[in-house]
Amino acid sequence: NQVFERCGYIDKSDHLFFDENEYNEAISKFPDIKSFIRLLIGGQEMLRGINKYALWITDEVYKTALQNDLIKNRVHLTKEIRKNNKPPYQFNKMKEAINTILVAPRVSSKNRDYLPIKFFDKNTAINDSVIAIFDPEEFIFGVVSSKMHMVWIRTVAGRLKEDYRYSSTLVYNTFPFPKITQTQKEKIEELVNIILDERDKDYLKTLAELY
């Protein structure tokens, strides 16, 4: 289960999305709709610290969500675009984590020494410009963000212009990482926490600035 997946929420309609101003205006006017909106993470959002949001409506809460006029209007506009292709209140694929999501950009600059990755909590949606592991073991962060993994990326990854295109099939699944003991995993996890602590010290900097 420790495999990166593409769970891209792709749609031609912008009506399911909110920029930061739209989000703040929406929850100010309708505080109750906050439970139907999630932070939306893509490559640029993750790397540059851009806040974008999306409606997250499961079948179980659909009727309740549509009692709100703002949501009802956005769903109606999306329905006009989608016609009868798929539900107008959901993305192409909706997968949820129990605790955390480990996210990596699908495209990363050739000038980076490490792949910039990040943990997000379970109340996060992702778009098609990233791939993710849902509920990973913490040591996976250390492996994927290591220098040796970056060497592998440079060797086997596809390219978008000159930048690296990270994929589960070509890069992650083929990475020749040996079986390790629980003690070794715990040591890697200690180092992961050191990295995360160092990031926290530079919390004003984006991942793009740090990497």
Q: Residues of each region from the PLM?
A:
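Extended amphipathic alpha-helical segments enriched in small hydrophobics
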Residues: 171-211
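Polybasic, glycine- and aromatic-enriched phosphate-binding surface used to engage nucleic acids
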Residues: 1-187
